[in-house]
């Protein structure tokens, strides 16, 4: 082709295609205005000053549109807050709102679901569609939560290539076709296979009952009650309570088996992270129960690396035994593809690379119980499944215990053996306080069913890839499932396919 070309040549080259209209628009008399919601929102705190309400009104004075966005994103409770003290989920919703209120020709949203819970993710998708579609503007979204991408998109472009080397963008496909092509790892229009294996989402089926006696409970120091009492093949924790100025958290007593993963699900700000911190001794419960007797490895939600050296130096310095263990290399290190960034400085890593290193560090630390807070954050679709497999394989093979906080519903269903559901109600005596209650660990289907019922959202499973899909609000399928009380349908993978799933999972 031509090595150089002017705007007229470009338009002529794409004559007769959909791109001709786009380039006519792009190279028109008026330069198009583009607004972007960035991937990394942490820097917003240092750039934007003032309360949420003040900042949004300064960006755009259109109060009618602003009120619609406030309602859809549930921003009422944070309008008086200063931007620099917002939590991750609050900051994400503010950044989305700040993008939506602006007048532009092209809107771009880079990972708008990060730090949002399932309900907020669905509302975010509704908000983008309801606010921008009537304007007939270009809207581009980069998103790694497949269920939200499915709910939000009209068309999908698949990106594939070699990270840090090159990338290829496919032609647009309809939403379902695009997602299926990406999961298959094959672009039929280009006759190109970019992944050797298809991505399958399989339910984390409950493992066989552990056999044998429970053994003896090991007493803590001085006979005092501990957060965790060790039983052979089990750990149990008592009733836990923690009160903050705006929330009161009550966790029902529970029990978890070795080689089992319990997912903590619920809306943001209901105490899931506080529960994890109580288990690992970083927060003391109101009842005065002492710190756990177990060794704990904790991967926090927000990762702020301060290490000055390379990734290799960090890993061999922090987890030398794991780095020389062949089983750990096979189960975790190799699948997470860490060797490719060994020579990179930790300070230069991207969000996804930092997350992968943090997961490896957490799993590599010698511990009895592993607590992972949002391990999917900043990971792409394929990396999320790889991380879920690595976590699952490590916990099963090492016979450890694991709690995971995760808002990506697909990743949650892949990881979970049991589910703890967090629900919150406004305090009748004090309206500014929320009473949060967490259930004991529930079975997979009943747990997710209770969780989705609290959100008034229904999911079904794709017959082919088995990935969970959100039903459109008030659709026929949505109404039928709610009427039957089945908010999470697994009928598509009942007995015939269940045996296939069990036989196809290799640990």
For the regions a protein language model found, what residue spans apply to each?
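ABC ATPase nucleotide-binding domain signature region
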Residues: 1-62, 145-176, 255-269, 273-325, ...
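Pre-NBD coupling/linker segments of ABC/ABC-like ATPases
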Residues: 2-25, 46-67, 161-253, 312, ...
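Conserved ABC ATPase "signature" region
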Residues: 61-79, 326-342
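Conserved ABC ATPase signature
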Residues: 82-86, 345-349, 353
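Hydrophobic anchor residue at the start of the ABC signature
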Residues: 96, 124, 359, 387
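Walker B catalytic motif
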Residues: 109-112, 119, 372-375, 382
């Amino acid at each position: 082709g031509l090595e150089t070309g002017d705007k007229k040549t470009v338009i002529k080259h794409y004559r007769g295609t959909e791109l001709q209209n786009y380039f006519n628009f792009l190279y028109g008399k008026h330069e198009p205005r583009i607004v972007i919601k960035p991937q990394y929102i942490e820097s917003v705190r240092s750039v934007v000053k003032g309360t949420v309400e003040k900042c949004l009104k300064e960006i755009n004075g259109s109060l009618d549109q602003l009120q619609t966005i406030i309602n859809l994103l549930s921003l009422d409770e944070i309008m008086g807050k200063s931007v620099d003290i917002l939590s991750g989920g609050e900051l994400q919703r503010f950044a989305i709102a700040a993008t939506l209120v602006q007048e532009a020709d092209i809107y771009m949203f880079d990972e708008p679901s990060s730090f949002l819970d399932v309900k907020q993710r669905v509302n975010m998708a509704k908000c983008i569609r309801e606010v921008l579609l009537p304007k007939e503007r270009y809207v581009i979204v980069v998103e790694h939560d497949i269920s939200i991408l499915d709910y939000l998109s009209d068309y999908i472009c698949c990106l594939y290539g070699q990270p840090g080397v090159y990338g290829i963008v496919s032609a647009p496909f309809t939403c379902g076709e695009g997602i299926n092509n990406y999961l298959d790892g094959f672009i039929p229009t280009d006759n190109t296979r970019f992944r050797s294996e298809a991505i399958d989402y399989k339910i984390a089926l409950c493992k066989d009952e552990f056999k044998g006696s429970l053994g003896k409970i090991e007493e803590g120091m001085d006979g005092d009650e501990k957060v965790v009492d060790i039983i052979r093949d089990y750990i149990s924790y008592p009733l836990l309570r923690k009160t903050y100025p705006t929330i009161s958290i009550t966790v029902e007593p529970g029990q978890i088996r070795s080689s089992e993963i319990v997912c903590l699900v619920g809306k943001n700000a209901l105490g899931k992270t506080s529960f994890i911190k109580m288990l690992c001794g970083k927060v003391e419960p109101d009842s005065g129960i002492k710190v756990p007797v177990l060794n704990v490895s904790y991967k926090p939600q927000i990762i702020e690396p301060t290490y000055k050296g390379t990734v290799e130096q960090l890993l061999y310095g922090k987890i030398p035994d794991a780095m020389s263990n062949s089983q750990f290399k096979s189960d975790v290190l190799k699948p997470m593809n860490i060797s490719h960034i060994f020579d990179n400085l930790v300070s230069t890593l991207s969000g996804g690379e930092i997350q992968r290193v943090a997961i490896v560090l957490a799993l590599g630390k010698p511990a009895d119980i592993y607590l992972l807070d949002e391990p999917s954050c900043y990971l792409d679709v394929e990396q999320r499944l790889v991380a879920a497999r690595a976590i699952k394989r490590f916990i099963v093979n090492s016979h450890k215990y694991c709690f995971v906080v995760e808002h990506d519903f697909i990743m949650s269903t892949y990881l979970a053996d049991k589910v703890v559901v967090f629900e919150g109600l406004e305090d009748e005596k004090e309206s500014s306080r929320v009473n949060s209650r967490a259930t004991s660990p529930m079975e997979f289907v009943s747990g997710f069913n209770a969780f989705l019922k609290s959100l008034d959202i229904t999911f079904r499973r794709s017959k082919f890839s088995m990935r969970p899909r959100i039903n459109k609000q008030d659709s026929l399928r949505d109404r039928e499932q709610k009427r039957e009380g089945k908010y999470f349908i697994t009928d598509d993978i009942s007995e015939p396919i269940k045996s296939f799933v069990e036989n196809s999972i290799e640990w």
